[in-house]
């Protein structure tokens, strides 16, 4: 689910957020982005 994406997904310094994005999409959200190295899902 969405909260597990925040814990599991690594957010790199230079905008690498593929892992976060994939996780959020699997959780049923539109996309995922990184904010201050934390994965955030966009419903």
UniProtKB/Swiss-Prot annotation:
* Gene3D superfamilies named among the record's database cross-references: Knottin, scorpion toxin-like
Q: Which domain of life is it from?
A: Eukaryota
Give a yes or no for keyword Protein biosynthesis in this entry: no
The answer to keyword Repeat applying to this record is no
**GO molecular function terms listed in the Swiss-Prot or TrEMBL record:** potassium channel inhibitor activity; toxin activity
Q: Which UniProt keywords apply?
A: Disulfide bond, Ion channel impairing toxin, Knottin, Neurotoxin, Potassium channel impairing toxin, Secreted, Toxin, Voltage-gated potassium channel impairing toxin
* First-listed, main subcellular location of the protein, grouped into a coarse class: secreted
Location of the protein in the cell: Secreted
Q: Which residues form each disulfide bond in the chain?
A: 5-23, 11-34, 20-39, 24-41
Q: Name one GO cellular component term.
A: extracellular region
Tissue expression: Expressed by the venom gland.
PROSITE patterns named in the record: ERGTX (PS60026)
Domain description from the entry? The presence of a 'disulfide through disulfide knot' structurally defines this protein as a knottin. Has the CSalpha/beta fold, which comprises one or two short alpha helices connected to anti-parallel beta-sheets stabilized by three or four disulfide bonds.
Physiological role: Reversibly blocks Kv11/ERG potassium channels.
The similarity comment for this entry is:
Belongs to the ergtoxin family. Gamma-KTx 4 subfamily.
What is the name of the protein in this document?
A: Potassium channel toxin gamma-KTx 4.9
Query: Organism, per UniProt?
Result: Centruroides sculpturatus (Arizona bark scorpion)
């Amino acid at each position: 689910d969405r909260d597990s994406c925040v814990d599991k997904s690594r957010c790199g310094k230079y905008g690498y957020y593929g892992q976060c994005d994939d996780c959020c999409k699997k959780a049923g959200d539109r996309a995922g982005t990184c904010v201050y190295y934390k994965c955030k899902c966009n419903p």
